[in-house]
Amino acid sequence: MSNRVVCREASHAGSWYTASGPQLNAQLEGWLSQVQSTKRPARAIIAPHAGYTYCGSCAAHAYKQVDPSITRRIFILGPSHHVPLSRCALSSVDIYRTPLYDLRIDQKIYGELWKTGMFERMSLQTDEDEHSIEMHLPYTAKAMESHKDEFTIIPVLVGALSESKEQEFGKLFSKYLADPSNLFVVSSDFCHWGQRFRYSYYDESQGEIYRSIEHLDKMGMSIIEQLDPVSFSNYLKKYHNTICGRHPIGVLLNAITELQKNGMNMSFSFLNYAQSSQCRNWQDSSVSYAAGALTVH
C-alpha cells in the first residue's frame, strides 16, 4: 500500500476563473465586500457553478453567510454533467487544489459514507472534467481562510437520482446536516434557456422572455424556500425547468424534511438572483443563477 497523496488539480483555473492566486483573492474579496451577512451562520447554502465572470457576484451572497469560526466540515454536493450516474459518487483523491490553497478531503467521513454501500467512486478523469464541485472550491477556501487548517471537505457528485433515492440520500445526510459544525454547499444553476439548451418555455403574460424566465425561476425558488421536496419535484415535472442541480437540491430538501420530523426548526431564504443575459428573442440564450442560505433557529 502506498501512502502517496493524490491531488485533483484545479482543472478549470485559467479558463472558468483566474489561475492567479492573488488575482483570484482580490476578485473574491471584491464580490464579498459588496454583500451583507444577514443569514449567518448558514447551515447550508445554494450557489451557482458557472464561470466567475458570470456568477461570481451572485455566489458571494451565499458565501458571505458562512461562519468560519464554527464550520469544520464542508459537504459539497454537485450534479454530474459528463458521466451518467444513478447514485452518488465520492472522489478518489486526498487533496483538491485551488489557486489559493489546497483543501483536504475528510477521509473519516468518506469512510462512513462508503460503508453504507450507497456510493461509487469517480475516476480522477471524471473528477477533473466536472466543474460543479470545483467552482465552489475557491469560494470555500476564501470564506474559510481565517481557519484554513481547521476544516475538511466532503465532495459528493450527485447522479440523476429517482425521488426515492433523493429521499434515501436525504435521510443519510440529515444526521450530518444536524451538526452545527457542518456546512452543506449545494451546487446549482437555475434556468438554462434557449435553443442551445433545447428549452424555450415562455409565458407571454410575463412580457419579455427574460421576465418569463425570472418568473419561472422564482416560482421554483419559492418552493425551495417552503422546504417541500414533493412540491419541488412536481414543479420540475410540470415545467421541466432546466435547473441542473435539481438532484442535489432534492437531497438537501429531503434531509431538511427528515430533521423537521425530529422537531428542528429551519428556514431557507434566497438572497440574490441574476441572469447571464436578458433574453428578448428566440435566438437568445441565458443561464440563471441564485444564491441562498439555510439557517437553523
Swiss-Prot record:
Q: Which PANTHER family match?
A: PROTEIN MEMO1
* Known role: May control cell migration by relaying extracellular chemotactic signals to the microtubule cytoskeleton. Mediator of ERBB2 signaling. The MEMO1-RHOA-DIAPH1 signaling pathway plays an important role in ERBB2-dependent stabilization of microtubules at the cell cortex. It controls the localization of APC and CLASP2 to the cell membrane, via the regulation of GSK3B activity. In turn, membrane-bound APC allows the localization of the MACF1 to the cell membrane, which is required for microtubule capture and stabilization. Is required for breast carcinoma cell migration.
**InterPro entries xrefs:** MEMO1_fam
Name of the featured protein: Protein MEMO1
Self-association and partners: Interacts with ERBB2 phosphorylated on 'Tyr-1248'.
> Which CDD domains does the record associate with it?
MEMO_like
Modified positions (Phosphotyrosine) in chain numbering: Y210
Please indicate which superkingdom the organism of origin belongs to. Eukaryota
> One GO CC term of this entry?
nucleus
Alphabetically list the UniProt keywords.
Phosphoprotein
The reported result of mutating C244A is:
Abolishes interaction with ERBB2
Specify the effect of W16A: Abolishes interaction with ERBB2
Family designation:
Belongs to the MEMO1 family.
Question: From its record, what is one biological process in GO terms?
Answer: regulation of microtubule-based process
Please tell me the species this chain comes from. Homo sapiens
Task: Quote the HAMAP family the UniProt record gives.
Answer: MEMO1 (MF_00055)
